[in-house]
From Swiss-Prot:
Gene3D superfamilies associated with the record: Fumarase/aspartase (Central domain), Fumarase/aspartase (N-terminal domain)
One Pfam family here: Lyase_aromatic
Keyword rRNA-binding: no
SUPFAM superfamilies according to UniProt: L-aspartase-like
Family: Belongs to the PAL/histidase family.
Catalytic activity: L-histidine = trans-urocanate + NH4(+)
Cross-link (5-imidazolinone (Ala-Gly)): A142-G144
PROSITE patterns per UniProt: PAL_HISTIDASE
Record's protein name: Histidine ammonia-lyase
Length: 511
């Protein structure tokens, strides 16, 4: 993989995606002097002797407690240890690696007051594949993602555990074996590592990247389902969508037309078809999927901005030697973005399930009942459709907005929170469930198209059919269905379905 060079404040979504997918990453060397200037400013601010939150005071409700100079290092160590209070299963390594890169890029903007030695260690851990074990639960998304980031910071001072090539090692051992040493934190550094929205943002970005692949896969399987049901491509006529002016809808309709272009199945019923209009699950794909695309893009803009911003507190301004307290740690923008991603993922799966239900119903599709040549003796796709319905219903429950569920913390000092971490963390599970639905639709749509032999679909869709049939044969009689579903899921999840249809350019979240 090509190395990603992080230019603080200017990292593209495609670069963040590459980091999430495992690309090596490092800071632009030009960031070094900026970081050093910020650390020097902290020393000058301390020399003035005035109380400054988080540098020589307590934290949260204890902000009024003044800390003496002799205890400043202990203060920073204590905040890391006391705040490493997360619970639950370890977060995915890919997500935490992205979180580390986000934190590194934020610190490198010179507004957090950390020393170059601190960013050097964090960068080295990313480069050497040392990923802290971070429990997935415990953040309310303000004041930042304190508990998750504390678990990251703890490993930097030799406490906690680190994943190294799949092994879970004590932090000190992992650092030493990689030729690294634990830090002694300086003034402000513990708070700077803990305070920020990087855990929430990493989870939301990871889901956004996976949701983009989900969206594109669903366009392909939706086109295949339209072919299987001998649906019309007339609803995808550009004149219809131009009049509405919704950009995602226009692009989605164009993609569906391109996916079906050159189909003998479609040409076989252009004339003499007594059906006037297809069901909404076919006909309204541009409207539903286009709306999903538009809000995924809206979320992408918000998350890209957040990923390139600084969400620490207080913020250090070296030009004036000021430390200003504010609320950039409040992750409301991330929470809102996560909520709309959840809506998009939910609806992508929902309309796909309706297409599956349509295909297995002979009254709607004109195909054999449950897509089996011998219905009754065989149950065919009866229960896979039930599984799809179950997954869609689970996602509907998870799509409830997290951002409206604030709860006071820290003795009411932190009395309104974003719940961004929960809102973002649920998304990967939602995408995984929706991918399973799309995998079932892939199986059902290809099975349905098989009944139209010797007629073929379009070149793009035939490529996808061939991809599936290389692993999963036509279902003539009932067999153990789970392996077929797992194979189809893997093709969706890996991006192979989208790659097989790559002769058609599919819209993505970056426009």
């Amino acid at each position: 993989m090509i190395e990603v060079v992080l230019n603080p404040g200017e990292v593209s979504l495609s670069d963040w995606k590459a980091v999430y997918r495992g690309a090596p990453a490092r800071l632009n060397e030009s960031a070094g002097p900026v970081i050093a200037q910020s650390a020097a400013a902290v020393e000058r601010i301390l020399a003035k002797g005035a109380p400054v939150y988080g540098i020589n005071t307590g934290f949260g409700k204890l902000a009024s407690v003044r800390i003496g100079d002799a205890d400043l290092e202990t203060l920073q160590r204590n905040i890391v240890l006391s705040h490493a209070a997360g619970t639950g299963a370890p977060s995915p390594v890919a997500v935490i690696r992205l979180m580390m890169a986000l934190k590194l890029a934020s610190l490198a903007q010179g507004a957090s007051g950390v020393r170059p030695a601190t960013t050097d260690l964090l960068e080295a851990m990313i480069v050497k594949g040392l990923t802290p074990v971070v429990p997935c639960q415990g953040s309310v998304g303000a004041s930042g993602d304190l508990a998750p980031l504390a678990h990251m910071a703890a490993t930097m001072i030799g406490v906690g555990e680190i994943f190294v090539e799949g092994q879970r090692l004590p932090a000190v051992q992992a650092l030493m074996e990689a030729g690294l040493k634990p830090l002694t934190l300086g003034p402000k550094e513990g708070l700077a590592l803990l305070n920020g929205t990087q855990f929430s943002t990493a989870n939301a970005l990871a889901a956004l990247f996976d949701a983009e692949r989900l969206f594109q896969s669903a366009l392909v399987t939706g086109a295949l389902a339209t072919e299987a049901a001998k649906g019309s491509d007339t609803p995808f006529d550009p004149r219809i969508h131009t009049l509405r002016r919704q950009p995602g809808q226009i692009e989605t309709a164009a993609a569906l037309r391109a996916l079906m272009a050159g189909s003998a199945i479609r040409d076989s019923h252009r004339e003499g078809d007594t059906r006037v209009q297809d069901p909404y699950c076919l006909r309204c794909q541009p409207q539903v999927m286009g709306a999903a695309l538009d809000i995924l893009r809206q979320a992408a803009v918000t998350l890209s901005t957040e990923a390139n911003g600084v969400s620490d507190n207080p913020l250090i301004f070296p030009d004036t030697d000021e430390a200003l307290s504010g609320g950039n740690f409040h992750a409301e923008p991330v929470a809102f973005a996560a909520d709309i991603i959840a809506l998009a993922v939910c609806e992508i799966g929902s309309i796909a399930e309706r297409r599956i239900a349509m295909l297995v119903d002979p009254a709607c599709s004109g195909l054999p009942a449950f897509l089996t040549p011998k219905p009754g003796l065989n149950s065919g796709f009866m229960i896979p459709q039930v599984t799809a319905a179950a997954l869609v219903s689970e996602n509907k429950q998870k799509a409830y907005p997290a951002s409206v569920d604030s709860i006071p913390t820290s003795a009411n000092q932190e009395d309104h929170v974003s719940m961004a971490a929960h809102g973002a963390r649920r998304l990967l599970a939602m995408v995984e469930a929706a991918e399973a639905v799309i995998g079932i639709e892939l199986l059902a749509a290809v099975q349905g198209c098989d009944f139209h032999a010797p007629l073929a679909s379009s070149p793009a869709l035939e490529s996808v059919r061939g991809l599936l049939r290389a692993q999963v044969p036509h279902l003539s009689d009932d067999r153990h269905f789970h392996p077929d579903m797992e194979a189809a899921n893997a093709l969706v999840r890996s991006g192979a379905v989208v790659a097989a249809a790559s002769s058609v350019e599919l819209p993505g979240v970056e426009g």
